[in-house]
Amino acid sequence: MPDLTTPEVKKLLAFRGYGNPSGRFWFVGMEEGGGDFESLQIRADEFANLEDIATSHAKFESHDMSKSISTWRIMSAIVGRISGTENWWETACTTNYQMNRLGRLNDETYLTEILPLPKRSLSDWPYGNFFDSPKSYFEQIFPAQLASLRLEYSESKSKPEFVFCYGKKYWPFHKKIFESIDFESALDDRILWGQNHSTIFVLTNFFGYGWTGFGENFVEKLCQFVLSKS
């Protein structure tokens, strides 16, 4: 881990996400990947609280927005299918959206996380100088993050039409953010969903291909279901 100062860690903790909170689509994960030395120091030195995903990640020498990344590809496919884009599942289509529109400040998507500090993996813990353990970090940070995300939703200039919270392990925390929503299961218990007067909320597995099941057929079923409720 880089020798981050306390003010730098506080800056990392204040990070909100990528894109437009007033956009049509929200994607809410648990925590962002990428807690290596390079990315942490760049984030601490150069990131604002809200970033454009393409311009901010261009600061990482190791990153390439033209490379198809499973999580972002599935986000792009969901947006494409709901928006009626032709060939929405094809890699060329999702990569083009990923490169040019996903997580852009003045566009239609907002990518945020329950926890603000990035990690390379679930077992990785590069913040031992500031938090005793991941459990201690969660207990200290989650209440403020919970309040922040609730406020961000309530104060968004126009409410998102669709909020996708991904990572089944974290459904209880996603449900706490949107505690006024009555969620029910659908698609053979593979999702939870609910809605208010302006937004459809969907809780899913993690956005990946293998056991999480986000192939073309499931994304088609998911989007058909969501569109039937809108």
Question: What are these regions, as identified by a protein language model?
Answer:
Residues 1-158, 207:
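A polyanion-binding, active-site-adjacent surface
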Residues 86-87, 162, 182:
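Secondary-structure boundary/capping signal
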